[in-house]
């Protein structure tokens, strides 16, 4: 399973660890992904999504039914 948010599309980024001596080594910044299930009133069922913490805030703001309809419009299976 890819480390990608289903709602926002956030994926790992590449950057550097920087020491006090300014030595740089490559590292990955991973999105804060959570496996969550949301209750959809309109569909009367639970919907499982792998979402980032930022996407949880988006779902709180817009509502799960709006977010799921946007996912389906993009062609994702939910």
From Swiss-Prot:
GO terms for cellular component: cytosolic large ribosomal subunit. One of its GO terms (molecular function) is structural constituent of ribosome. HAMAP family: Ribosomal_bL28 (MF_00373). The gene is rpmB. This is Large ribosomal subunit protein bL28. GO terms for biological process: translation. NCBIfam families: L28 (TIGR00009). It comes from Aromatoleum aromaticum (strain DSM 19018 / LMG 30748 / EbN1). It comes from the Bacteria. PANTHER family: 39S RIBOSOMAL PROTEIN L28, MITOCHONDRIAL, LARGE RIBOSOMAL SUBUNIT PROTEIN BL28M. InterPro entries: Ribosomal_bL28, Ribosomal_bL28/bL31-like_sf, Ribosomal_bL28_bact-type, Ribosomal_bL28_sf. Belongs to the bacterial ribosomal protein bL28 family. Keywords: Ribonucleoprotein, Ribosomal protein.
């Amino acid at each position: 399973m890819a480390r990608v948010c289903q709602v926002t599309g956030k994926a790992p980024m590449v950057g550097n660890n920087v020491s006090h001596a300014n030595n740089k080594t490559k590292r990955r910044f991973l999105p804060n992904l959570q496996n969550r299930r949301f209750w959809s009133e309109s569909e009367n069922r639970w919907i499982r999504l792998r979402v980032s913490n930022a996407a949880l805030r988006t779902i709180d703001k817009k509502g799960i039914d709006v977010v799921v309809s946007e996912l389906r419009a993009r062609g994702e299976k939910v």
